[in-house]
A protein has these predicted regions:
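Extracytoplasmic copper-binding redox domains, predominantly the cupredoxin/blue-copper superfamily
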Residues: 2-127
Length: 127
């Protein structure tokens, strides 16, 4: 009778521990959903972007400083609007709307956090 641990059993256990550790570490590094920024519901939007069928329509809009864009979610899938700089972030929605007022000139790129191929741009240009 032998009381030693076999090499195979030792390696199997080590690989299992390493795999479980890697899974925990990677889960801790996952970006998760961005924190929503409240909608500017009290502001009248001058442009509406429809969010449907894995696209923003229109994908590019131009407004003046102080104006707002409203994203109208019309299903059937869940989407959000997340600015590259996180200056505006909607919740994940199937239906409903999200409005953001832009005060500074610039180009604001955004995408859907769960469908990153969905991309759009808001250009804020002084008249």
């Amino acid at each position: 009778m032998t009381w030693g641990v076999s090499r195979r059993r030792l390696l199997t256990g080590a690989v299992g521990v390493l795999g479980a550790s890697a899974a925990v570490l990677l889960a801790g590094c996952a970006p998760g959903a961005p924190e929503p920024v409240p909608s500017d519901d009290d502001v009248q939007a001058v442009v509406t972007v429809t969010v449907t069928d894995n696209r923003y329509e229109p994908a590019e809009v131009e407004i003046a400083p102080g104006q707002a864009v409203q994203w109208e979610f019309v299903g059937p899938n869940e989407h959000d609007v997340v600015a590259e700089d996180r200056g505006f972030v909607s919740e994940l929605l199937v239906e409903g709307s999200y409005t953001h007022q832009f005060s500074e000139e610039g180009e604001y790129a955004y995408l859907c956090s769960i469908h990153p191929e969905m991309q759009g741009v808001v250009r804020v240009v002084a008249p």
